[in-house]
């Protein structure tokens, strides 16, 4: 076989290997991607009970109810069109409040309500942890005094 043909075959094999590796990486990434359903998407999808999903949206103002045990809360997640009642038992993140963004990991009960096992509070790009806010305020005060 000529050297030209050997290089061509080697190039084809290398190209096939790169395509196969890319395909495998894409399949693996798709399985690991963490998408969430908005309330509208969840209602349209008619998701089966006890299937774990992520539900994302805004905590509806006026919907947050804390039970006397101190760890159980009930609230509604909305995307502006649909609302879904959510129950959660556990400690909520500091940023969790009415009107803020939330992603809840959990499942729908046979009754249609959503039981969250984990709650993630979303924040905007201007968020600063409380310690950083205190440091920034102290720096601002120091600069104003000078």
UniProtKB/Swiss-Prot annotation:
InterPro entries: CcmE, CcmE-like_sf, NA-bd_OB-fold. Coiled coil: none annotated. It is found in: Cell inner membrane. One of its GO terms (cellular component) is plasma membrane. The chain crosses the membrane at residues 8-28. It is a single-pass type II membrane protein. The keyword Membrane applies. Residues 1-7 are cytoplasmic. Residues 29-146 are periplasmic. Its main location: membrane. Heme binds at residues 123, 127. One of its GO terms (biological process) is cytochrome complex assembly. Heme chaperone required for the biogenesis of c-type cytochromes. Transiently binds heme delivered by CcmC and transfers the heme to apo-cytochromes in a process facilitated by CcmF and CcmH. This is Cytochrome c-type biogenesis protein CcmE. It comes from Zymomonas mobilis subsp. mobilis (strain ATCC 31821 / ZM4 / CP4).
